[in-house]
């Protein structure tokens, strides 16, 4: 039985109980839970399609993921789907790590030893260093066993059974607190930490260069545990988006696309879209870029000086902060069967061509007096080296689900971390299209060296997504995929796991926030978690409001 009854019929057609802005996984999660409680909820999305950075698109019969290449459960994703009554089949998604001609597949924790053996073959002068680093990885994996040792209680039925409380939840909470303290002692940047273990910069870069810049040590090393948790939804990552959409609509929720919120009047609780639509609300959830949120608040209509001061403080706090590294992705359609790529890369691979890594390559090489050079040759030569010594993440959907490419063909998704400001600079120099062609040819060349000679002859179509195109599409600061950069000092948002419930609150009581900009480190599981926490906070406030209006009798 639902605790809430929608007030839709008693108010104008432009009034809703809750407006959710942004249809990424955080917004979809929150809307699903709010609609489940029969609140009158409206989800607004500025693009023509929902899903944000999660989901896929179809090109000539190939289904290609636009964001996450796979799904990490983290004790959150599968319990969330189960709680909502959504049944999705998840397929195997083994991770390969390939460096030069050396390769391993991570299937269980014992494979970390094989990873260490591979590193020792590549760097025989650093065997003792590698042994120490392996112990660090295994130490973090043990902490992860506790942190994700049970399914997140937030997504389990309540009230909890006594047996679960006494034998599972309470013992886990005790261990959780102890291990979060251990985790908090490992928040130095991963490269700095590894320099206390080895002086081989190539070894350091090979381990870390596919992580976001300045990633804290614990979160970087925890990926060796998370790699074992990767799964792939049958039908592509779009399956999750479609199932959540279907649930929202079946529960009476509403979704409107091509509606970009341009103004929020926090006093009258009204929003206005760029398309001229106006809505009033009781509660609002912002599940999009934080900078954009504070920019669309109409400060002229705020009567409370205290509230205005808090909002202006937030604006100032975020104005010079940078988003995390963005990603450049090349989508390639090949007239070759999947097995040509399967033996080398598998369905999901981190492929590094050169064991030297990015140790001798830096953005500073193409900067002068803090500005990027305008010398085209210098820029393109640097990009060539950057790709050659970098780590490419290669995802091949058809190797997980054979229905995702036409028979005898393969769709490849090849990506690497890339700097937003550099792409913006190339665009300003009118080199954007040439840059995309250049980097595509580099990717194909390196894939060809590992797979099929003259691979370019078999590639019949390519599409390139850059940090700039991500920023234009999503309005995410600097085209970020995972919120704020760890390099920001001070860090602009909450990062302490024990305070994550508070992260969804904003200075405005009637507005909550969720998604990658709300809590770091961000990703699909954390975005889902903040979406659920935000929906719980909204439901609590709505219950409180209805209780006051009815004198509390219905809720005593």
Predicted regions and their residues:
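Extreme N-terminal leader/targeting segments of oxidoreductases
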Residues: 1-18, 36-37, 505, 546-556
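N-terminal glycine-rich phosphate/pyrophosphate-binding loop and immediately adjacent elements
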Residues: 6-149
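A conserved FAD-binding loop/helix module that cradles the flavin
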Residues: 68, 516-538
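Active-site/ligand-binding neighborhood in enzyme catalytic cores
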Residues: 138-251, 258, 476-492
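A glycine-rich dinucleotide-binding beta-alpha-beta segment and adjacent secondary-structure elements
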Residues: 200-211, 389-395, 453-520
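Mid-domain catalytic core of redox enzymes
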Residues: 233, 242, 262-267, 272-406
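Glycine-rich, aromatic-lined ligand/substrate-binding cores of catalytic
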Residues: 326, 332, 348, 390, ...
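Flavin-binding catalytic cores
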Residues: 366-387, 432-472
């Amino acid at each position: 039985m639902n605790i809430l009854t929608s007030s839709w019929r008693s108010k104008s057609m432009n009034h809703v109980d809750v407006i959710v802005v942004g249809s990424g996984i955080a917004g979809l999660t929150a809307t699903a839970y709010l609609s489940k409680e029969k609140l009158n909820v409206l989800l607004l999305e500025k693009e023509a399609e929902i899903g944000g950075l999660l989901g896929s698109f179809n090109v000539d019969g190939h289904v290609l993921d636009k964001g996450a290449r796979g799904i990490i459960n983290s004790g959150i994703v599968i319990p969330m789907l189960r709680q909502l009554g959504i049944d999705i089949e998840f397929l195997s998604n083994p991770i390969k790590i390939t460096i030069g001609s050396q390769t391993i597949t991570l299937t269980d924790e014992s494979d970390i030893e094989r990873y260490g053996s591979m590193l020792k073959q590549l760097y025989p002068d650093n065997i003792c260093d590698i042994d120490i680093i392996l112990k660090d990885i295994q130490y973090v994996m043990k902490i992860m066993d506790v942190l994700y040792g049970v399914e997140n209680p937030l997504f389990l039925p309540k009230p909890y059974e006594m047996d679960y409380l006494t034998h599972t939840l309470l013992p886990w909470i005790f261990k959780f607190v102890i291990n979060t303290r251990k985790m908090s002692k490992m928040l130095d940047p991963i490269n700095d930490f590894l320099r206390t273990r080895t002086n081989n910069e190539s070894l350091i870069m090979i381990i870390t260069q596919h992580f976001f810049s300045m990633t804290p040590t614990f979160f970087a090393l925890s990926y060796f545990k998370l790699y074992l948790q990767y799964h792939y939804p049958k039908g592509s990552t779009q399956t999750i988006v479609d199932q959540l959409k279907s649930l929202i609509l079946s529960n009476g929720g509403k979704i409107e696309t091509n509606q970009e919120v341009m103004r929020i009047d926090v006093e009258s609780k009204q929003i206005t879209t760029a398309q001229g639509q106006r809505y009033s609300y009781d509660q609002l959830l912002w599940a999009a870029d934080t900078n954009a949120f504070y920019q669309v608040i109409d400060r002229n209509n705020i009567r409370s000086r205290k509230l205005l001061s808090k909002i202006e403080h937030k604006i100032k706090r975020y104005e010079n902060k940078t988003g995390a590294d963005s990603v450049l992705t090349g989508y390639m359609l090949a007239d070759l069967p999947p097995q040509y790529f399967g033996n080398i890369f598998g369905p999901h691979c981190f492929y590094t061509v050169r064991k030297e890594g990015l140790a001798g390559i830096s953005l500073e090489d193409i900067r002068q007096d803090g500005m990027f050079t305008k010398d085209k040759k210098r820029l393109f030569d640097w990009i060539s080296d950057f790709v050659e010594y970098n780590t490419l993440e290669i995802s091949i959907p058809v190797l997980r689900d054979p229905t995702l490419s036409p028979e005898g063909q393969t769709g490849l998704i090849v990506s690497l971390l890339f700097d937003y400001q550099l792409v913006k600079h190339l665009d300003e120099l009118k080199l954007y299209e040439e840059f995309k062609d250049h980097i595509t040819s580099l990717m194909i060349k390196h894939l060809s060296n590992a797979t099929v000679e003259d691979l370019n002859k078999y590639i019949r179509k390519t599409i390139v997504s850059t940090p700039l195109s991500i920023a234009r599409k999503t309005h995410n600061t600097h085209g970020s995929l995972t919120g704020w950069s760890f390099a920001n000092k001070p860090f602009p948002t909450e990062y302490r796991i024990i305070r994550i419930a508070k992260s969804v609150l904003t200075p405005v009581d009637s507005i909550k926030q969720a998604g990658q900009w709300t809590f770091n480190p961000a990703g699909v599981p954390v975005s889902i978690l903040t979406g659920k926490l935000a929906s719980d906070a909204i439901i609590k406030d709505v219950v409180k409001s209805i209780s006051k209006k009815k004198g509390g009798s219905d809720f005593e």
